Every structure is written in structure tokens, then in C-alpha cells.
Amino acid sequence: MLTRKQHELLLFIDRHLKQTGFSPSFDEMKDALNLRSKSGIHRLISALEERDFLRRRHHRARALEVLRLPETMPAATGKPPLAESGPPPVTAPATDESAAAESFVPNVIKGDFANRLAGASVATEAGAIHLPFYGRIAAGQPIEALRETGAQIEVPMNLLGHGEHYALEVAGDSMIEAGILDGDTVIIRRGDVAQNGQIVVALIDDQEVTLKRLRRRGSTIALEPANARYEPRIVPSDRVRIQGQLVGLLRRY
């Protein structure tokens, strides 16, 4: 269980990332927690790293990544946690899941993306970058393996961290309780490894592709939907290849 200060700092960083797209400075964290020096922030961040709640992106300034949120609140101290005060977080679709360690809170960029392909502009103050757009991926039932189309999509740079990325369009409703809706465009960090509880693009038998939450169970992998209407799909681990992890989401309004 986290201490109150660790809990407050984690929620402050998470809220700041959702509102601004980048990590708070050490001065901002120090002031938010009413600490006298930055050394206290360094100790709290190190403790959160050791408990796998937070990760520093090395070689980048102000680069912190929240890996998960705590399942329980800190012990009562007569003072409410930091997250209960201050401005509300960026609006995201409601989810039936609690703020569990593995819950994904969509970093939603709203806008008119009707003409977003083939170099169409998605203007943001933070700038934008072109990513490969691989078309629709089933969030309800697996579909054929992805084929490169040559299409591209322009996305805000603040959705991206380190690594190589690509974009997919969601088809289906099996991830709605994680805030991922039919027609959303998801941003995927390319990679072949993932932690338990992460939402991933999984390739099954080199033929089917699906967007689900990953759960390892001995020699098998459970690909879990975020919709009570669907059952998890249990597959031997040697039949599943991870194609990337979900890092962001675009929604057309």
C-alpha cells in the first residue's frame, strides 16, 4: 500500500499528464505536495518506481509515465488525497472498471478526423507527426492479420512517447468499459512484449488480430474484453504474438 504522499504524487502526475500531455516539473510537484525541497520528490518518485507505479523515460526531460494506479486509497489521515481537490481531469468516457492497477484511462483527443487520412491535418499547439494507418481492427471479434495500406494519419505529438508507433481504427464494442468505442482510432506503440493487464494488439496463429487486455495464465494467455457481454479468449501462449501496446486514442466528433 502506498503512503499518502506517494498516492498524492502519483495522482497529481497522472492528472497533469492527461491535462497537458507532459509530466509536471519538480517545482510543480514540490508545490503541489507542499514539500520544502525537491529531494523529497526524488525519493517519492524512486519509491513509486520500485513499486512499479511509475517509470522514468531516460534521456528525456520531464518524462514520467504512470504504469498503473493503486487499487486502494491511502490510510486515513484526516486530509483528503490530492486528487479530490484542484481542477478536474481531462474528460474521458465513463468506465465501469475501478481505478485498478491495470485500468486504461484513454488519452482522448477530440476533433473532426473525417478527412484525417492521406496527410490530412490534425492541428495542435504541440505539433503533429505522421503515423502508418493500418485500417480497422476488431474490438469485438478477431479479424484477418493487418495488411499495410500505405495510408498515414497525422496525430498530436503529445500522444506519443518513446518508440515506434502506428494507428488502427477500432471496430466493435468489446472494449467499451475501458472507454474504447467503435470507430475510435487507437495509437499503438510497436513492441512484442507487454505486462499483465496492458491493452495490446495481439496476433493469433499469425492470422487473426484483436485489441484486448492481456493476462498470462501459466502456459496460456487470456485476451480479455472490457464488456460483460463477451467472454475472454484463452489461447496457448505459443500461438499469440504481441504486436504493440495501446498508448493513446483519437475520437471523431
Swiss-Prot record:
InterPro entries: LexA (IPR006200), LexA-like (IPR039418), LexA/Signal_pep-like_sf (IPR036286), LexA_DNA-bd_dom (IPR006199), LexA_repressor (IPR050077), Peptidase_S24_LexA (IPR006197), Peptidase_S24_S26A/B/C (IPR015927), WH-like_DNA-bd_sf (IPR036388). Pfam families: LexA_DNA_bind, Peptidase_S24. It catalyses: Hydrolysis of Ala-|-Gly bond in repressor LexA. Keywords: Autocatalytic cleavage, DNA damage, DNA repair, DNA replication, DNA-binding, Hydrolase, Repressor, SOS response, Transcription, Transcription regulation. GO terms for biological process: DNA repair; DNA replication; negative regulation of DNA-templated transcription; proteolysis; SOS response. Represses a number of genes involved in the response to DNA damage (SOS response), including recA and lexA. In the presence of single-stranded DNA, RecA interacts with LexA causing an autocatalytic cleavage which disrupts the DNA-binding part of LexA, leading to derepression of the SOS regulon and eventually DNA repair. Belongs to the peptidase S24 family. PANTHER family: LEXA REPRESSOR, LEXA REPRESSOR-RELATED. This is LexA repressor. It comes from Gluconacetobacter diazotrophicus (strain ATCC 49037 / DSM 5601 / CCUG 37298 / CIP 103539 / LMG 7603 / PAl5).
